[in-house]
Amino acid sequence: MKTKAILLMVFFLGWVTTGWAADHVKGDGKLTSKKISVTDYNEIKVDGVIDFNYEQSDDPSTVEVTVDQNLHPYVNIEVKDRVLTIAFKGAKVDHFTKFIVKTNSKWLAAAKVSGNANFMVNSPLTGDETVIKANANSLVQLKETVTVGKLDLNVSGSANMVVNHLEADKIECDIDGSGSITIKKGNAK
């Protein structure tokens, strides 16, 4: 019994000190942009309050982040197994003015969008197969023509998707929750 009490106390102290260890930062209101080159990717994972702008392009992949000047050191940009993820790391960010990302790659096989993210594809999108999943309260907008063999759209929670123009051999849509998928015009089998 004595050992359990000691272990419980050590666990509790470790848990409390871990909470104190994280830096809490707030944005300073001075928006700045930084642009870097990244290795090529074909999948994107977005989570949180972020305006994410994607373009399909033959140009080398880059990421431009606009956020409060003092928060740039906490922005983590990582490409692992051809998956791009961007998030705050190393601090608990309590408030920021804006968090805007602009990026490009040669093609997009998949995107997973969650939280209150706003994910916009601002160029024509082409490829064999593209899977886009959105959940929570996110918004996905495919603003230009999407020409793919198969487009798989999955919405859960209160997420919404808007496809302005679709040209696909096959489309699959799945909605779970109060979200929506809107296809304004186009053709699919």
Task: Provide a role label for each language-model segment.
Residues 1-189:
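Intrinsically disordered, low-complexity terminal regions
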